[in-house]
Regions:
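Glyoxalase I/VOC metalloenzyme domain signal
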Residues: 1-24, 32-85, 92-168, 173-174
Length: 174
């Protein structure tokens, strides 16, 4: 993603995000707006780097706000979704995650915690926060094939107790 970095960072700034912190040990940046955190990972050999090699510039992980992540981990294990906690040599956040059907990591984040992993892993910078137009994210669209769509529907219904709606086809602007 280094080639796309200048364009992507300009787009993020144009959308109102601020580059607020740098990871203490890795080539990773934290961008924020309101309660939304975007992590831009350019670390060689990382999960994000491998995901980029397979999919190109894309989102490789999501932090999902769930009440009682420990219960979500238990439920994921009961449904045979393997839970990972990252590589203890490189990841210090300790957030549990499962792999989504399209290969992205789905992290379980407790909305009641102040997310101390941000303070533990990142050092703030002096970029001034911009006006916030986005406070939170409540919907995301993911491109996937039909089989992945069926797997995603099952995962979200079984694990998160979400009810599917009718599919929506969105044209690719490229």
């Amino acid at each position: 993603g280094d080639a796309e970095y200048p364009k992507l960072s300009a787009i993020l700034r144009g959308l109102g995000f601020s580059f607020t912190a740098t990871h203490k040990a890795k080539h990773v940046e934290r961008w924020t707006q309101g309660d939304v955190n975007l992590v831009f990972n350019r670390e060689d050999g990382s999960f994000a780097n491998r995901y980029y090699d397979l999919h190109g510039l894309s989102v490789c992980a999501y932090g999902l706000s769930v009440e009682e992540p420990s219960k979500m981990v238990t439920r994921a294990n009961q449904l045979s979704y393997p839970v990972s906690y990252g590589d203890p040599n490189t990841d210090t956040h300790g957030l549990p995650a499962i792999m989504g059907p399209e290969g992205a990591q789905l992290y379980f984040v407790d909305p009641n915690e102040q997310s101390p992993h941000w303070d533990r892993e990142f050092v703030g910078n002096d970029e001034a926060a911009q006006n916030s137009w986005i406070e939170t994210i409540d919907h995301i669209a993911v491109t996937m094939d039909h089989e992945q769509s069926l797997q995603a529907t099952l995962l979200h219904k079984a694990l998160f107790n979400l009810n599917p709606t009718s599919p929506l086809n969105v044209l690719d602007p490229s």
